[in-house]
Amino acid sequence: MAKTKYEVTYIIKPDIDEDSKKALIDRFDKVVTDNGAEELESKDWGKRRFAYEIEKYREGTYHIMTFVAENSEPVDEFGRLSRIDNQVLRSMTVKLDK
């Protein structure tokens, strides 16, 4: 089966401390790899101001992860867990061209 390349961008609440932020990022990286994906890159974009408020926040910490997977299981599990976690304000997953 052909592997598909995905990019996930998620926004973390700005008031979370550094240790908790690192633990959150590590947990989401592990969720993706535990579900059969190969992580290519995981990088922090830092704090950025929003164009509009999200859950009463005017800024958030952006994080981007790129990975390849044979099926959508890592994407589905990441989406499910990011919606449950109250430290994540928003997330978006896109399928990249080969």
UniProtKB/Swiss-Prot annotation:
Binds together with bS18 to 16S ribosomal RNA. SUPFAM superfamilies: Ribosomal protein S6. Pfam families: Ribosomal_S6. One of its GO terms (cellular component) is ribosome. Keywords: Ribonucleoprotein, Ribosomal protein, RNA-binding, rRNA-binding. It comes from Lactobacillus gasseri (strain ATCC 33323 / DSM 20243 / BCRC 14619 / CIP 102991 / JCM 1131 / KCTC 3163 / NCIMB 11718 / NCTC 13722 / AM63). Belongs to the bacterial ribosomal protein bS6 family. GO terms for molecular function: small ribosomal subunit rRNA binding; structural constituent of ribosome. This is Small ribosomal subunit protein bS6. InterPro entries: Ribosomal_bS6, Ribosomal_bS6_sf, Ribosomal_S6_plastid/chlpt, Transl_elong_EF1B/ribsomal_bS6. The keyword Transmembrane does not apply. GO terms for biological process: translation.
